[in-house]
């Protein structure tokens, strides 16, 4: 029996990155031998065991053979005669097909070290094309390591295109697509994930609402980048700088979906694109089974981001109504989330990356003013039932009117 550290732990250690999870491959052993040594078996489809002390995963070396459609249609073979090289060959990328023995020596049968040095994401073998999930995984790795200068090898991107055009991605379940997307949204450069999907044709298959934005022009006065798809990825990049929250980043990604519905004869203007985009947000989220909390914020951002841009022109009554509409009284975090997504929208434009966004400050200040109106004072004044809410609204409007007179500049 020989045990090797494999995959991501080896890769990230070589890149000088923190190692989170460690996975091990066991060569020359059997399930019974592992059980006798005190390991606990957890793999149902193939032999994976938990170490009795560390609870890290130890898998018997195995090979995989395509036996059906999609990413689950594989038959696994695990036996003492499966070599380490056999096991590593089934991995997706060469940089993930590295192993380390107990002496610290790196085993590299597929030039993963060379690709690490050259910052290349390259598939190990043609078997890559048998698993459509790998298209998403490579896009996610491209986003995860973009800041280190990694790019996808030309031959790998070609294979990803071939897989997409062959309809392989249609076998992916919504849950797996969302899981990979959510993970990509946590990276430093989530926009790279969607750009890679577009480069290989997968964006049109998995995110048609986003793909439809490319080639749709916006007024050059407000959008020097012109193309709404490019603007969308720029705003996502900006959102990633402003917030680590997946819901803020996803909502920013979806903020302009309604522009994809504008008839070409009306271009480059997109009047009413915000409310129009709400249905597309719901459609996308339902298809991918996006969690409700993330979906709800995306809907609100699509509907209200343009309103927040015009904050100096809003009357106090409209501002209070906005807080009501986003359910800020029960979910106050939404005020900050809308401020961030709206800022990402403004700064996600060519030449505006460092622009100030005072509307965000005013929105936050107005919220603090509205919040400071005490409910207790309304009740003590003798108001009852529905009168309490009506009077509370009147006082909030008055408080914001007073604040706005002093703090928020009047529109020209």
Swiss-Prot record:
Alphabetic keyword roster: ATP-binding, Hydrolase, Magnesium, Metal-binding, Multifunctional enzyme, Nickel, Nucleotide-binding, Nucleotidyltransferase, RNA repair, RNA-binding, Transferase, tRNA processing
GO MF annotation: an example: ATP binding
Protein residues bound to CTP: 8, 11, 91, 137, 140
Keyword Metal-binding: yes
A Pfam family it matches: PolyA_pol_RNAbd
Stored PANTHER family: MULTIFUNCTIONAL CCA PROTEIN (PTHR47545:SF1)
Cofactors demanded by this protein: Mg(2+); Ni(2+)
HD domain boundaries: 228-329
UniProt-recorded name of the protein: Multifunctional CCA protein
Any one Gene Ontology BP term: RNA repair
Domain notes: Comprises two domains: an N-terminal domain containing the nucleotidyltransferase activity and a C-terminal HD domain associated with both phosphodiesterase and phosphatase activities.
Taxonomic lineage: Bacteria, Pseudomonadati, Pseudomonadota, Gammaproteobacteria, Enterobacterales
Chain's gene name: cca
Oligomer status and interactors: Monomer. Can also form homodimers and oligomers.
EC number: 2.7.7.72, 3.1.3.-, 3.1.4.-
């Amino acid at each position: 029996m020989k045990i090797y550290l494999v995959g991501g732990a080896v890769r990230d250690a070589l890149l000088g990155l923190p190692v989170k999870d460690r996975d091990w491959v066991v060569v020359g052993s059997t399930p019974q031998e592992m059980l006798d040594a005190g390991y606990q078996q957890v793999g149902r489809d193939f032999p994976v065991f938990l170490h009795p002390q560390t609870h890290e995963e130890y898998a018997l070396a195995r090979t995989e053979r395509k036996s059906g459609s999609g990413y689950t249609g594989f038959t696994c073979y695990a036996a003492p005669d499966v070599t380490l090289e056999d096991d590593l060959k089934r991995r997706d990328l060469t940089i993930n097909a590295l192993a380390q023995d107990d002496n610290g020596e790196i085993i590299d049968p597929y030039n993963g070290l060379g690709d690490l040095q050259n910052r290349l994401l390259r598939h190990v073998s043609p078997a890559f094309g048998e698993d459509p999930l790998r298209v998403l995984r490579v896009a996610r790795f491209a986003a995860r390591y973009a800041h280190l200068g990694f790019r996808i090898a030309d031959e790998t991107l070609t294979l990803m295109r071939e897989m997409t055009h062959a309809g392989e991605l249609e076998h992916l379940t919504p849950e797996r697509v969302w899981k990979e997307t959510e993970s990509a949204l946590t990276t430093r450069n989530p926009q790279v994930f969607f750009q890679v999907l577009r480069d290989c044709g997968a964006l049109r298959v998995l995110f048609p609402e986003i793909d439809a934005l490319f080639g749709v022009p916006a007024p050059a006065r407000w959008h020097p980048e012109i193309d709404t798809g490019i603007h969308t990825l720029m705003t996502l990049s900006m959102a990633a700088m402003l917030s680590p929250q997946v819901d803020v980043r996803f909502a920013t990604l979806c903020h302009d979906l309604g522009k994809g519905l504008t008839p070409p004869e009306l271009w480059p203007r997109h009047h009413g694109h915000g409310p129009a985009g709400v249905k597309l947000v719901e459609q996308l989220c339902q298809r991918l089974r996006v969690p409700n909390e993330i979906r709800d914020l995306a809907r609100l951002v699509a509907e209200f981001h343009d309103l927040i841009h015009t904050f100096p022109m809003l009357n106090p009554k409209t501002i209070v109504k906005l807080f009501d509409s986003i359910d800020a009284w029960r979910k106050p975090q939404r005020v900050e989330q809308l401020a961030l997504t709206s800022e990402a929208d403004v700064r996600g434009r060519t030449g505006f990356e460092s622009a100030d966004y005072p509307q965000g400050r005013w929105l936050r200040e107005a919220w603090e003013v509205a919040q400071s109106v005490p409910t207790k004072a309304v009740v003590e004044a003798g108001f009852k039932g529905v009168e309490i809410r009506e009077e509370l609204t009147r006082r909030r409007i008055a408080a914001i009117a007073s604040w706005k007179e002093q703090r928020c500049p009047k529109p020209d």
